[in-house]
Amino acid sequence: MKYTSPSISDKPLVLYHAVSSYQLLEVILHRMTYHSRERTVLILPDFITQKYPQYKKLVTRRLFNEVYLFPYLHILHREEQQIFEDVKLCYEQIIPHPITDFSEIYVAGAHFYFSLYLIQNRMPFHFFEDAAGMLSRSNELYETLAASFPTHARIARKHRLFNGESPYICSVICLKKAQTIDVSGERYVDFSVEEVLQNLPERKRNHLIHFFLKHRLWTKAEAILLTQHFANLNMMSEEE
């Protein structure tokens, strides 16, 4: 399933992937900050429509140029090679752009199966931590997923998709001050959802937040509370 805005085909293509509410806010703000002039494509999980049936507004409000729903609910947790084949088929049936057409690829929720398509095609990508400080607690993320989806968790850990150490990950985007591990290396990029949201002009901030909430945010403090609320969603179930 897809939703797109009128074509602006002359501009470079940038791809984003997100799964949770926090990650969606994260990639929206990152796009606003670093890729506002490029043509951006967003991949969301098909189950996000349960939480955000208004997902098409991401395009009509010009937050992204194209949005596609990846059919995670239809990919069975079976043998790894079969999962690779299923993911390849899903991507090539749903996304009308060869993966090599993208100048940059950003993945939040990298432990989800879409990342396997990037690995299969040897495509470098940028990794977002799952929520503020979660990079330092990647084993918790693995254990939570393994409790319900052991095959999924095993494959993601094998390819180092919880801790951002896959050789195909060219940078790790995280909130540095929230980490308890060493993130001083060049591959670690500091990004604060809270600060970017606070610093948006009020009109733009409320325009964005109206996608998530029905009422207006009157103060920056309310915006901070919202991001903290999203940060607490880092242990969401796969269906959420």
Model-derived segments and spans:
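N-terminal beta-strand-loop-alpha-helix module at the start
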Residues: K2-V41, H210-E240
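Generic low-complexity segments that are intrinsically disordered, proline-rich and/or Lys/Arg-biased
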Residues: S7, L13, H97-I99, Y168
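Acidic/glycine-enriched edge-of-secondary-structure segments
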Residues: I8-A18, N65-I83, E194-L200, I224-M235
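Active-site and donor-binding regions of nucleotide-sugar-utilizing enzymes
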Residues: L15-R157, L161
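A conditional alpha-helix N-cap/helix-loop micro-motif detector
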Residues: I83-K88, P201-N206, E238
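A nucleotide-sugar donor-handling region in carbohydrate enzymes
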Residues: Y142-L233
